[in-house]
């Protein structure tokens, strides 16, 4: 009898221990145990890749393909055959995973944000165009803002941060599938040759949808570069490099006279035409303009869904810029400092709201020179590769893993790769990095930026004022002259009628 009681007691102890371990493991997987709202359930209704969007900057054409079940199978088989290659390992953290079929689990939380009342994409593009042409007048416009409670990614939850990082890595994935691409550019008046299929050179976005919760996540592809940034794949290198050098350099990637600049805004030593750079950023064949199209087309496909943004490297910076433009949440990974291009684009910010209170979170670690803004100088890896990564300042909040002290890492460009961030940072830390206000910094402090448009107006006003003063002085002189020498009248004439005597 006593032996049976001991056996039962041992079974109870084992059961309690199992439950304790299970609860601890569940809390650990949730990061800090935050009780955010789940955006996935046991039936697998989470986020799946539903569309791939591509943009051709040469013809200013965007196209989209729906990810069908047939495409999932063929694309996952292609990835499986490439398992173990440098290509796969550079963008996907789990070799052999199925990125086209994977169901992502994200958690959300409520957050009060200030955003524009009119967030219609057409209205926003008109405002940005106007602010670039007339920045002084744009500052006088009183935009209408609203405070709204929205659902944002719970960045305190490790699984949520991990899922967004995997989505960002997913955006690097190429597929051999070339059928059923739809042209989405007809509304922009495109009349040239339509290109369908996989376009290697341009911006790409992977669109993940949760049809139950009506949330859409747009993951924007980062920089592709052979042996430099993160993907190991050579697609989109040319345009990625142009946009990197335009967005994150002080002046068109003018490092020295040996460099070929990406725009003609350089004036002289450490002097740059500010209006020229701003206009270059908004050109229709640049990536920021492409992200505006991407957002517009996704909102047309899912008008009743909330939009979240994510991306790695260049893709993260573009996600942050797009998030500020429309007031939607953005979570980035190892993004270069994007505060300078945000200011150059004159993106709206609620009056009195510090930029660190926006719904933008930048995750990164201090062994990545691009995220830290230290990959510059003639001998840096970025400069040797032809990249002018001169910005360090971020908008929103700053979430940094201290791998230098915690893991003994040294600053190295290889640490920028997305798969290393996922495998050796996010997965190895028990909790996500704490998000806080970004350090105070100033980009390009030693440069002089000339506002030629403002100078021309001031010169014109000065010229008009000088002309008015000269005219006024001339009139006063004439008045004084006529007053000092009043007109004389004739007081005597000869027999012919000619005046011979004058008097006052």
Swiss-Prot record:
Keyword vocabulary terms for this entry? Autophagy, Endosome, Glycoprotein, Hydrolase, Lipid degradation, Lipid metabolism, Membrane, Signal-anchor, Transmembrane, Transmembrane helix
The catalytic activity of this protein is classed by the Enzyme Commission as: 3.1.1.3
The positions making up the signal sequence are none
Task: Give the record's glycosylation annotations as residue positions.
Answer: 183
Renumbered to this chain, region (Disordered) spans 458-484
How does the record say this protein sits in the membrane?
Single-pass type II membrane protein
Q: Which residues cross the membrane?
A: 2-22
Q: Main localisation, per the record?
A: membrane
Gene3D superfamilies the record matches: alpha/beta hydrolase
Task: Report the enzyme's class at the first EC level.
Answer: hydrolase
Spell out which residues lie on the membrane's Cytoplasmic side.
1
Q: How does it assemble?
A: Binds to both phosphatidylinositol (PI) and phosphatidylinositol 3,5-bisphosphate (PIP2).
Please give the family membership noted in the entry: Belongs to the AB hydrolase superfamily. Lipase family.
Q: What is the designated name of this protein? A: Putative lipase ATG15
Organism of provenance: Candida glabrata (strain ATCC 2001 / BCRC 20586 / JCM 3761 / NBRC 0622 / NRRL Y-65 / CBS 138)
> Which lineage do the record's taxonomy fields give for this organism?
Eukaryota, Fungi, Dikarya, Ascomycota, Saccharomycotina
Gene name linked to the record: ATG15
